[in-house]
Amino acid sequence: MAVSHPIFARVFARASVAMDRAGAAAHRRRLVAGLRGRVVEVGAGNGRNLPHYPPAVTGVLAVEPEPRLRAALQAAAPDAPVPVTVAAGLAEALPVADASADAVVLSLVLCSVPDQVVALREARRVLRPGGQLRFYEHVVAETPGLRRAQRVADATLWPLCCAGCHTARDTVAAIRAAGFTVVELDRFRFPPAGIPGPASPHVLGAAVRP
């Protein structure tokens, strides 16, 4: 159940704070706004989404496979505005009963799961009919030049340096192919200024399990 990336975990812990200061915190608030009931957050990392959950959420099961990130997540859980339970687990094998969640939250995780199809199938399995999939991910670029740069990055050092992360995944298409209906979708660049990099194109949205 454990996925160990000690160097990446240390780097990500620092980088996530800087990202939030640069505007990611606002995206995290939008990601979970309006949620209610029981939520499963997959690949919850070091818990940067936890402060933003609204009070209508009755509980969050925060699943994280990397031990160091999970320890940071556990430390952050008591300060969350809603009850949080931390668990070890993989996106492809969630420790959750069928049709038991009102929402599943995916935040910068579908870029690095070994199998998006299986991970999204699991998300659909644990959601009740009509439940929401909320997603905030970096994705394949819409411009040919940046797509070429992403393919080069994915074929060389990027996955090795970033714990299996891939930049050229068409995550929105994968969500639709998994049987979800996308009801909200915002495409943007992050960070918003400077020269775009392989991980600059982002999406934030919501999908519904029929």
Predicted regions and their residues:
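Conserved alpha-helix/loop element of class I SAM-dependent methyltransferases that forms part
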Residues: 15-38, 48-52
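A short SAM/SAH-binding and catalytic strip from SAM-dependent methyltransferases
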Residues: 102-115
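A short glycine-rich, Lys/Arg-flanked "PGG" loop and its adjoining helix->strand segment in the class I
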Residues: 117-129
